[in-house]
Amino acid sequence: MLLQGTHRIGRMAMLLALADENESPVLSIPKDWKYCTGKVGSMNSQKVVAAMETAAKSNQVIETDVYRETHALYHAIMEALYGVTRGQIQLADVLRTVGLRFAIVRGTPYDGKKEGEWVAVALYGTIGAPVKGSEHEAIGLGINHI
C-alpha cells in the first residue's frame, strides 16, 4: 500500500495549478491518468464548484452518470476550497471574491490496485474584497478516493 514516489497525485495537481498559461510544468503524468485545468472567478462559491465539476465532466476526468465519481470530486473540491478560504467557504456573504486557476487529476497513486482511483483538486489564485488590489494569494488542495 505504499504511495508511489512518482505518482504523487496532489503534487501533480498543485504543479499544474501553479503553472502560468505560457508555462508547461515538467510532469510525467502516467498515461492512464486523466486531468484537466481551467480558471474560475466569482463571488459565488456554488459557481466555483459548478465550473470545476463541469470541466471534469467535459474533459472525461469523471464519468457524468456515475454518482460516486461526482461525489468524490465534490469532496475534493470542498477540501481545496477550505484551504483557499481558510475554512470559511462563504464568499459573497462576507464580501469576498476569488480568481483561481484549478487542476483536477485522477489516477492511482498507490502500488496496490486494491487502493483504487483517487482524485486531487488544486486551486491557486487570489481571494479578497471585490476591490482591485485588495486581494492576496491563496492555495488549496483536496484529495479524495473515488
UniProtKB/Swiss-Prot annotation:
This is Hut operon positive regulatory protein. GO terms for molecular function: mRNA binding. Antiterminator that binds to cis-acting regulatory sequences on the mRNA in the presence of histidine, thereby suppressing transcription termination and activating the hut operon for histidine utilization. Keywords: Activator, Histidine metabolism, RNA-binding, Transcription, Transcription regulation. The keyword ATP-binding does not apply. HAMAP family: HutP (MF_00779). Coiled coil: none annotated. Belongs to the HutP family. GO terms for biological process: L-histidine metabolic process; positive regulation of gene expression. The keyword Transcription regulation applies. Homohexamer. Gene3D superfamilies: Hut operon regulatory protein HutP. NCBIfam families: PRK03065.1. The gene is hutP. Pfam families: HutP.
